[in-house]
Amino acid sequence: MEQEICVIGFSGGQDSTTLAVWAKKRFKKVCLVGFDYAQKHSVELECAQKIASLLQLPYEIIPLDFLENITHSALFKNSNDLMGHSHAQNKDLPNSFVPNRNAIFITLLHSYAQKLGASNIALGVSQADFSGYPDCKEDFIKSIEHALNLGSNTAIKIVTPLMFLSKAQEFQMAKDLGVLDLIIKETHTCYQGERKILHAYGYGCDKCPACQLRKKGFEEFQAML
């Protein structure tokens, strides 16, 4: 186990929960940080709080509800846009994309890491099985790590152990870590905030892009067994 502190961007979803369990086994102290950005699926914050308690890890929520006032996304509570279409600001991106969201998240995590004296920030981003978001790619993560360290005269590392894992491989990782049941029953991925129906892969509407990606990954995981 590394004798260092690690700050995790934590949504209460499959990726960040798997990441939190992984980090807990590797770092002396792990701190979870969530963001309330007026997302439709704000139920994820409730799930994150419960998971943090189950994992016995400290959890902070940073309010960022101003985001919906400065940019567009179908993920915002007040948006009437239906998922599955092109973004109003960039036709090459899905409308669930929140421009600069990860840049803002990572900047705040970097600041918080400095306050705690943390040497590491861990993110559950993946470019192997993602939703078409450019701010989940390795080149972006490496670039912002370099820029933030230059701007703060620091050497904080951003670790992304899920970067090249598919959703199926993430389910396998959760199984290997002994938390597959936790991932299925407690984490939240659905963009519509659906928590009434438990599918084999977890709760969700079974229709939005996030549910479809998770469902596909679980089916591929089952085929691997």
Curated annotation (Swiss-Prot):
Enzyme Commission code(s) on record: 6.3.4.20
GO molecular function: ATP binding; ligase activity, forming carbon-nitrogen bonds; zinc ion binding
Manner of cofactor binding, per the entry note: Binds 1 zinc ion per subunit.
Residues at which ATP binds: F10, S11, G12, G13, Q14, D15, S16, T17, T18, L19, A20
CDD domains per UniProt: QueC-like
Keyword DNA-binding: no
GO annotation, biological process: queuosine biosynthetic process
Transmembrane intervals: none
Pfam families in the cross-refs: QueC (PF06508)
Functional pathway: Purine metabolism; 7-cyano-7-deazaguanine biosynthesis
Positions bound to Zn(2+): C190, C205, C208, C211
EC main group: ligase
Cofactor field: Zn(2+)
Superkingdom of origin: Bacteria
Catalytic activity: 7-carboxy-7-deazaguanine + NH4(+) + ATP = 7-cyano-7-deazaguanine + ADP + phosphate + H2O + H(+)
Assigned keywords, A-Z: ATP-binding, Ligase, Metal-binding, Nucleotide-binding, Queuosine biosynthesis, Zinc
Function statement: Catalyzes the ATP-dependent conversion of 7-carboxy-7-deazaguanine (CDG) to 7-cyano-7-deazaguanine (preQ(0)).
PANTHER family for the chain: 7-CYANO-7-DEAZAGUANINE SYNTHASE
Family from the record: Belongs to the QueC family.
Name recorded for this polypeptide: 7-cyano-7-deazaguanine synthase
Annotated gene: queC
